[in-house]
């Protein structure tokens, strides 16, 4: 298949919206006397396209609404993005990004991507330590501890592009509940204020801070005998003595998140991650609350530690483990939008795999060679970004990051993939896809090839690399839009008006309505990623009961080796009646009450947009096209009856799954043999589609 001609970019739909000719060769970071030609940003177009909403990037991020703050971020971000591309990255990286061979994420932010922080350090030291800024003593009460957490996450969010995470929320806050003898109502009030405060759009661009909390449920072994400090003073008990207080905190958090806001909307943040270990109690009163919340809104991520060689407490020692052996790929920890303590990601680059399949149709060897070239470019950009950001940390440009982190040594450089299903379709002339055995095998070979390349990069650079199923919320539409313009014959998902590529190595969104078939087909692919990855079980409406939801999650995690899982029911919000199950564009209750002569009352339809919940109306063009094509999973019959009465659900057990080839990553969901399992019956019956 012939490649489309490479052209100088004046395309206003390119990621930066700036145009100039192909730049001359230049050093990676050009000195002042050898700077490349300046990039001209058209101020009229920049402002007017935002005000008119004629630029699709206005809605690229569903967490950022059309607003004055959004305009300021859009305009400033365009300048910063062009600075990265024209003044920091070499011409070949700039060209690859502008032309859509790859996507360098977060170009509009002069900072790192995501970070996990030590909540224990914050609670023991108090939020401060930055000269000239307000300092707080170590908190003595739950409300002040939660207030400092809000301030910390909001402040650090302004120094990073992506998610900010705390681990062991329930374990580390339990001493404050014990110390003050707080009642359930007092704990609930404090947690309610905390959750509401985290959902205020206080971040640049009128965005809500993107936050993640991991909850332990039971005290991790590494903290069990540790003595907490409250207000800087040791307590007469250990963390292991505080299960009752942990239960109170979990109960309060679950009740607040289930209730939603004053209009019945789900809280988008913090994204809660629950650690499912061998001793996870599936039948406690809090488990009932957890699965009632999951059945209604589908908010949590479930992190699968069943059969794993890691434990939840490892998030506190991961920063020590990361440097042990650069010949091994390690997991970042805590899911797609979480990071273990003092780790995270410096930056992310996603590769347009669909285009590779088209340009190298029928020649897998040529595809892998081209992939190698893009990996080299991605690594070049990530090494340069690490150098620039670390230098600015050292100079105090990010004062709170310098105080609470200091070094990016334990942060990963992240490379991701997009459109593997379309890659296989284009490579095979549409004979194969991820739904066929051979297409599945091709995807595995590509991921294994990438894993081997990342090991080589670690050894060559001395820096950590990981492979991520990047969310690519905006990049998937940008890739498809650019490819449709350049390669009219390329195979894509969506329509002419709303093209997109299937995310990472996921199944096509309309392939099956059987969640267990999807789990069976995905577990081997999911296990290849060492950065973030998750399998979302999109449902058309709320799960029929908490018991059925519990059994769905339990069966998925114990029988399939997927590292992370969500249950994602679609729901709607009526301005009068609040929460409505399922996709309801207009409110049926209002129609009944108002009579046939009244106009319809429009509802907000909510679901997950690659990791977090937002109204579908706020999705970008590509994600709206994906939502329109999605076939929701049906709830398997008999889940509630199989779960049995309360108290009888089985405890967690090691899953049975298929083994990934190549170097086995440390982390959730390791591989093992795959015995026959009734939950897989749909997969065997379906065959290759």
Regions found by a protein language model. Give the residues of each.
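Intrinsic, low-complexity terminal and presequence regions
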Residues: 572-647, 680-689
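Conserved catalytic cores of very large enzyme subunits
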Residues: 29-409, 430, 436-599, 605
């Amino acid at each position: 298949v012939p490649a489309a001609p490479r052209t100088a970019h004046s395309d206003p739909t390119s990621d930066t919206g700036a145009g100039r000719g192909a730049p001359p060769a230049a050093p990676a970071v050009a000195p002042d006397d050898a700077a490349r030609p300046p990039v001209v940003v058209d101020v009229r177009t920049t402002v007017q396209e935002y005000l008119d909403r004629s630029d699709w990037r206005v809605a690229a991020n569903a967490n950022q609404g059309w607003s004055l703050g959004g305009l300021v971020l859009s305009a400033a971000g365009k300048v910063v993005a062009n600075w990265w591309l024209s003044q920091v990255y070499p011409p070949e990286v700039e060209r690859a990004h502008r032309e859509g061979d790859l996507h360098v994420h977060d170009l509009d932010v002069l900072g790192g991507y995501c970070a996990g922080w030590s909540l224990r350090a914050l609670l023991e030291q108090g939020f401060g330590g930055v000269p000239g800024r307000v300092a707080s003593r170590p908190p003595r009460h739950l409300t002040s501890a939660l207030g400092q957490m809000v301030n910390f996450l909001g402040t650090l969010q302004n120094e990073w592009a992506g998610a900010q995470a705390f681990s062991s929320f329930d374990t580390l806050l339990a001493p404050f509940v014990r110390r003050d003898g707080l009642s359930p109502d007092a704990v609930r009030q404090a947690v309610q204020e905390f959750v509401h405060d985290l959902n205020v759009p206080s971040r640049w661009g009128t965005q809500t801070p993107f936050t993640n909390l991991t909850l332990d449920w039971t005290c991790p072994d590494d903290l069990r005998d540790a003595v907490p400090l409250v207000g800087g003073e040791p307590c007469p008990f250990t963390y292991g003595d505080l299960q009752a207080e942990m239960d109170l905190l979990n109960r309060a958090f679950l009740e607040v998140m289930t209730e939603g806001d004053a209009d019945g909307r789900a809280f988008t943040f913090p994204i809660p991650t629950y650690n499912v270990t061998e001793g996870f109690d599936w039948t406690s009163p809090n488990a009932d609350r957890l699965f009632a919340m999951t059945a209604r809104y589908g908010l949590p991520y479930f992190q699968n530690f069943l059969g794993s060689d890691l434990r939840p407490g490892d998030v506190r020692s991961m920063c020590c483990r990361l440097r042990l052996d650069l010949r091994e790929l390690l997991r970042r920890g805590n899911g797609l939008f979480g990071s273990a303590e003092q780790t995270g990601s410096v930056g992310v680059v996603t590769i347009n795999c669909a285009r590779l399949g088209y340009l190298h149709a029928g020649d897998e060897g040529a595809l892998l060679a081209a992939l190698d070239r893009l990996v080299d470019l991605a690594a070049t950009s990530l090494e340069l970004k690490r150098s620039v950001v670390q230098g600015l940390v050292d100079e105090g440009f990010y004062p709170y990051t310098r105080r609470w982190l200091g070094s990016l040594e334990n942060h990963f450089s992240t490379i991701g993939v997009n459109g593997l299903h379309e890659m296989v379709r284009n490579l095979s002339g549409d004979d194969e896809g991820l739904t066929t055995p051979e297409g599945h095998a091709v995807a595995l070979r590509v991921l294994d090839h990438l894993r081997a390349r990342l090991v080589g990069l670690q050894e060559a650079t001395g820096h950590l690399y990981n492979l991520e199923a990047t969310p690519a919320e905006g990049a998937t539409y940008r890739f498809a839009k650019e490819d449709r313009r350049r390669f009219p014959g390329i195979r894509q998902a969506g329509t002419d008006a709303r093209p997109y590529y299937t995310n990472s190595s996921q199944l096509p969104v309309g392939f099956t309505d059987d969640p267990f078939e999807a789990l069976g087909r995905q577990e081997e692919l999911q296990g290849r990623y060492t950065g973030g990855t998750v399998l979302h079980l999109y449902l058309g409406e709320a799960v029929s009961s908490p018991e059925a939801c519990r059994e769905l999650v339990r069966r998925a995690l114990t029988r399939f080796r997927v590292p992370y899982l969500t249950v994602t029911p679609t729901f709607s919000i009526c301005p009068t009646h609040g929460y409505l199950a399922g996709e309801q564009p207009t409110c049926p209750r209002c129609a009944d009450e108002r009579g046939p002569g009244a106009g319809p009352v429009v509802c907000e339809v909510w679901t997950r947009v690659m990791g977090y919940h937002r109204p579908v109306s706020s999705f970008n063009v590509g994600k709206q096209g994906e939502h329109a094509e999605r076939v929701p999973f049906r709830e398997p019959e008999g889940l509630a009856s199989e779960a049995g009465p309360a108290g009888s659900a089985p405890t967690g057990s090691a899953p049975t799954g298929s083994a990934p080839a190549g170097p086995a990553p440390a982390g959730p969901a390791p591989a093992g043999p795959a015995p026959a399992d009734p939950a897989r019956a749909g997969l065997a019956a379906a065959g290759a589609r």
